[in-house]
Amino acid sequence: MKLSKKGEYALRSLINLGIAAEMKRKLVQVSELAESEQLPVKFLEQILQALKEAGIVESQRGKFGGYRLGRPANTIFIGEVVRLIDGPLAPIGCVSQTAYEPCTCPDEAHCGLRMLMVDVRNAIAGILDRYTLADVVEITLRKMRRDSISLPFSAQVAGARPRARVPARLAREQLALRVRSTRKGRTSPTEGVLHHILGEYSI
């Protein structure tokens, strides 16, 4: 499985909408979402429309309109979003649980390749179907706070000057430098970065 650009942008936008909700922002404009992650606006609008049709986000029109999550973040599973945008998680059709397609193998039940790909599918699904958007938002905010990164999408008080935000790319570079400077060891591939968000590890 390879996440497409469309799938990547969908997840990044949802994470930002989740962060905005935690920051008590009611709505986020498409242009703001695009700017925060340096994404093309027109392409992002198409992705948000697909998410809206699935009920994952909702929008409000008007001068002060924008997007917000259509469901609680703890009910939006990452695997659901990936399947919606990119299709089945399975690397080959004959092991898919949601879009099965017979393969050309004459003996599917005893096909070694299929057995291997079942394990691959289960490993991918086991991670993407375990975590919700709320989980990813939580660890993102925890790590940003730990590394003193300016939090995006803070609710603005009327009349107050908006706080300057660090551009997404620069923030990621600063974060990488902090992590490398304090790293003591690497996370085991079987443990997962999400479980070690407060530890010292390399992303």
Feature map (PLM): residue ranges:
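Short amphipathic alpha-helical interface segments
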Residues: 10-24
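A short alpha-helical element within helix-turn-helix/winged-helix DNA-binding domains
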Residues: 27-38
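Short, hydrophobic-biased segments on the C-terminal half of alpha helices
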Residues: 48-49
